[in-house]
């Protein structure tokens, strides 16, 4: 059970009510869209207290907005964290999260089995500003241990990997990270808080591309990070940024003065202030609309994905299916531990005949859409090596488990029988 207003409620209740209440002036039930850039101050002293971080409140919509705040409160409640911060996209949240932990000369250890754009951001863009990322096999715990040194600032993994749906052993990775005084960062985009709450397994920070399953309708871009409030920066020699006075706030020491909220406070007041990747109020409103049906959608999507994966697994023209919910999957036991409600809606498969056969399959589909997004109400398909992971080298593709014939399927809300029929006719084409 989860808690709100001093009472314990279930997940489905929180996904509808957490973070909002009827407007006190108009008594409107729905969340208002506060389409504003700025806010009035009660006095000069009031403004000064806000700017000095001595009092909470709205200053400027680059840093906070009431509509966005409601979204942040809801996600924090669903994830089980002490606070959350929404930004313009999942990529923006990821980039800012790592800049909030690391700087030039520092290192991050990351799974290699992640979204191709994330590999490029970590391995190229962060490298250009002096942050080195060591990519390792997510299932090789010894490799994670061996990659740690005195400059390591974070472990990063996707709860369910993109695109091959490998399931991370979050608990074991968090144990290694914490033994070295390092925070565990988990991307929960493919699971959402309904299927998995990484904080319960030791994650310190949880990242979502809310653009995907949280929003659920392909209408709004947004990213969110939740702070578990569990990582103690105070006195940790790896994090001088949290233990030394910050000159831009007249000597604030985030670990000391902000306590458990040091990370999320610094992320808002420095990263969002300086880099400006704020979430638009309308986008926050649209994501909130999607969250109200989250559990219903994720249950349906997971059930349909399992049905489709089983059908493809038995098809004579299908060479492989990577879906962790299948009893034959190497990750099936982890699904029982980490994903008991369902294994999500994204997986990969390939046909005998290589890339040409996979391309013909995609081009022959009539109902399923050829799109690079995932987490939509509609079922989507793509060829990772040509799209989401096209920036990777052949070696990186191999390390990520992406073959030339691999296609990625993101299952939507349609009748699974209709989706299976469309796949069958395209395979036969």
Model-assigned labels for residue ranges:
Residues 20-22, 35-41, 212, 229-230, ...:
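Glycine-rich beta-alpha junction loops
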Residues 80, 151, 317-320, 367, ...:
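Glycine-centered tight turns that cap/initiate beta-strands
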Residues 38, 43-95, 117-124:
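Conserved N-terminal alpha-helix of the aminotransferase class I/II PLP-enzyme fold
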Residues 2-6, 15-17, 21-24, 84-315:
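Conserved PLP-enzyme active-site core in the AAT-like
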Residues 1-2, 123, 132-134, 150, ...:
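PLP-dependent enzyme catalytic core of the Aspartate aminotransferase-like
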Residues 275-278, 282-284, 289, 293, ...:
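Conserved small-domain helix->loop->beta segment predominantly found in fold-type I
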Residues 1-55:
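N-terminal glycine-rich, Lys/His-bearing helix-loop that initiates the first secondary-structure elements
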């Amino acid at each position: 059970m989860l808690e709100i207003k001093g009472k314990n409620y279930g997940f489905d209740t929180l996904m509808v009510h957490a973070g909002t209440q009827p407007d006190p002036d108009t008594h409107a039930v729905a969340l208002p869209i506060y389409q504003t850039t700025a806010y009035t101050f009660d006095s000069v002293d009031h403004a000064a207290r806000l700017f000095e971080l001595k009092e909470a409140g709205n200053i400027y919509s680059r840093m906070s907005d009431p509509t966005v705040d409601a979204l942040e409160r809801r996600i924090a409640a669903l994830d089980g964290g002490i606070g959350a911060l929404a930004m313009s996209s999942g990529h923006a949240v990821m980039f800012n999260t790592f800049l909030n932990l690391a700087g030039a000369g520092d290192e991050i250890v990351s799974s290699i089995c992640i979204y191709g754009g994330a590999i490029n951001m970590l391995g190229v863009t962060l490298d250009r500003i002096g942050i080195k990322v060591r990519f390792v096999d997510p299932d090789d715990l010894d490799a994670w241990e061996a990659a740690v040194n005195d400059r390591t600032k974070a472990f990063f993994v996707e709860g369910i990997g993109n695109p091959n749906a490998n399931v991370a052993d979050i608990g074991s990775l968090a144990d290694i990270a914490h033994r070295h005084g390092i925070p565990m960062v988990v991307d929960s985009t493919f699971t959402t808080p309904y299927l998995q709450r990484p904080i319960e397994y030791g994650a310190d920070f949880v990242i979502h591309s809310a653009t995907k399953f949280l929003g659920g309708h392909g209408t709004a871009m947004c990213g969110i990070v939740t702070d578990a409030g569990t990582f103690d920066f105070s006195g940790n020699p790896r994090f001088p940024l949290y233990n030394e006075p910050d000159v831009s706030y007249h000597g604030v020491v985030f670990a000391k003065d902000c306590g458990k909220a040091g990370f999320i406070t610094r992320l808002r007041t420095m990263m969002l202030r300086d880099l400006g990747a704020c979430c638009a109020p309308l986008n926050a409103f649209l994501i909130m609309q999607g969250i109200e049906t989250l559990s219903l959608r994720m249950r349906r999507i997971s059930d349909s994905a399992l049905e489709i994966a089983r059908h493809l697994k038995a098809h004579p023209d299908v060479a492989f299916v990577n879906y962790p919910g299948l009893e034959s999957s190497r990750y099936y036991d982890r699904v029982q531990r980490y994903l008991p409600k369902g294994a999500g809606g994204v997986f990969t498969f390939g046909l005998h005949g290589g890339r040409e056969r996979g391309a013909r399959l995609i081009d022959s589909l009539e109902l399923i859409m050829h799109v690079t997004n995932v987490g939509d109400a509609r079922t989507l398909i793509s060829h990772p090596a040509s799209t989401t992971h096209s920036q990777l080298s052949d070696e990186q593709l191999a390390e990520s488990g992406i073959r030339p014939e691999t296609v990625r399927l993101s299952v939507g809300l349609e009748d699974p029988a209709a989706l299976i029929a469309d796949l069958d006719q395209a395979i036969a084409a």
